[in-house]
Amino acid sequence: MRASTVIPRWFWMRTYNKTMSSTVILLNEQNPQGIFVDPSVPLISVDDQGFTRGDGVFETMLSVNRRVRKLGMHLSRLESSARMLDLPDPEPEILRSAVERLMREATAGAETALGEEHIVKIIISRGPTQAVTSMQPGPYTLIMASPVPASIVKRRTEGVKAMLLPRGHEPMDNSAYPWLLGGAKTLSYAVNMAVLRYVQERGADDAIFITDERRVLEGATSSVLVAKIEDGKKVLYTPEPSHGILPGTTQGAVFEAARQAGWELGFGPLYPQDLFESDGVWLASSVRLIAPVTHLNGTALAHDPEL
């Protein structure tokens, strides 16, 4: 990496905060503890496999008042994803320290009802071409913070219109075909973004994937939560945590809170009719939090704000 890509701390403090909306720390072999870098100049090689092939992993987190929520859960999932891709194990204490340092120096976040909010991302790339088949060191890590967009905050209260879409292939047990990377959060998100464009062109906001057998899986970038009142009992469901579903940190946190509040918990299988007949459906993700699904395939769904 050229020295010009690294800016001195004194310069960063004086000018960088005033001109950039994102704050970035780079960790690599030369700087294992991380250094602040200027995101407006080149930081990676043109043959980096994260850039050319999506060969890497990432996590997206929410920071409120400069404290990252569920950081431990995200670091655990990042480690699991890296292991599936045969990337070196991330060092959680180094990453935790870098995240905390980043948030102390980050530019101003978005002011919301929760406080000052930032999106925080950790990205680990495979590195240059020669790192693809060898186990030689090569990966680098970027950690960045930026204000949460108003459009995301809006979804928390106004909800989303969703469409049911087939996954396109029958999900398998994660362990049977490890090269399919089921349950890993990889940089290969082209399909997810194509899905969002597809539904938005048709008047919806998001998608919920289903199998060929019409079992509910997950959202394009979220977990699915379904509430039902059964014989006077509140039950919260999510699809069974197999079949290539990414384990949701927000879903896990919501389930724990619901359990403590006296809810019963269930793990699928769920079908479209379960969603249509439910007392509430939500898409759960770390930054958007819990967005109510107001319409599914154009049909209005029940939604009780008290739930």
Can you annotate each of these PLM segments?
Residues 1-2:
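Compositionally biased, low-complexity intrinsically disordered regions
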Residues 96-131, 146:
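Short, acidic/charged, Gly/Pro-enriched secondary-structure junctions
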Residues 8-93, 97-101, 130-307:
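Helix-start/capping segments and mature chain N-termini
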